[in-house]
Amino acid sequence: MSNKLVLVLNCGSSSLKFAIIDALTGDDQISGLAECFGLEDAKIKWKVNGVKHDASLGAFSSHREAVEFIVKDVLGAHPEIASQIQAIGHRVVHGGEKFTQSVIIDESVVQGIEDCAALAPLHNPAHLIGIRAAQASFPQLPQVAVFDTAFHQTMPEKAFIYALPYKLYRENSIRRYGMHGTSHLFISREAAKAMGKNIEDSNIICAHLGNGASVTAIKGGKSVDTSMGMTPLEGLVMGTRCGDIDPSIIHHLVDRLGYTLDEVNNLMNKQSGLLGISELTNDCRGIEEGYSEGHKGATLALEIFCYRLAKYIASYTVPLGRLDAVVFTGGIGENSDLIRAKVLNLLEIFNFEVDDERNKAARFGNQGQITTDNGTIAMVIPTNEEWVIAEDAVRLLK
């Protein structure tokens, strides 16, 4: 264990993921999840050296109580780890155009995150609560914000401007921002290493596939296009999000079918995607099980998911010009050999030849190439966003 440990916090509206990461190796010393904030059964679970623990936080507990528990109970039991923590790293979903890289948190940064809350109303307010809670519990430690959107700030205007009146961008910042940037950044580095290339000479397409999913074209280590938009709703079919649709559907739902705008927002974010199509589940494992059993809805959901993903990957060869590799990551990307094979088979024109043995081996945390040596490379690389956050925190403190 090095003396460069960072406590990484990822605050959701009703949960808090945490991990203590060695910034040199990426290893986690402690990791856990506090959840059900505001409810009677608010709880926390964590793991130290492979040993699992859990506890109640007390009815209606919040982020503050969770951070206090981490300090007093989790770290209190491991002073040898607590004494080595150098900084707190916060994942922040949306930094708008203001934050193009990670920053040390001060009051101006807090205000900037608050100013971007309209672009991520479910996420940024929760991040601010977590930042305040961490500042109260760790007043002696520097705090660093790492933004999901920052990696995509290298996109050219032709990739991020919507074909709406330009003044909406100029006056209201309506544009494509993209998400999962920290994951895409990590994957771009690791993919270049795996291919034995300098990152400046590598062109990859990264597919981060989980309940939320996005694809990014990365040229020379920089994002040049990405599938998520102003919000995480645009792009691929996801667990409960619809991804790309005809915008006039919104007017039709409101004007003809009597939906309110809030109901439409809920429908497209929480009732659509794999769940909406299959009428079964948003969990890809359940979709694959239904597919294997001949469930019509699950089969259709799986086919649409793979088809949409393959189309995006194909289109991102345009900004790259040359494709060195496609990389799958995220919960689905790292574990579903079925989806990977289906997607790559749809991309046969790009000379992908799936190696069934390699594809099945690259699951459950295993990294590796999943195509034959004769064609274009596709590989699986498990993501590690926490490591990027820890690295950035230590780098900024130098």
UniProtKB/Swiss-Prot annotation:
Membrane-spanning intervals of the chain: none
Cofactor: how bound: Mg(2+). Can also accept Mn(2+).
Amino acids binding Mg(2+): N10, E385
UniProt GO cellular component terms: cytosol
Binding site for substrate: R91
Family: Belongs to the acetokinase family.
Protein name per Swiss-Prot or TrEMBL: Acetate kinase
Organism lineage string: Bacteria, Pseudomonadati, Pseudomonadota, Gammaproteobacteria, Alteromonadales
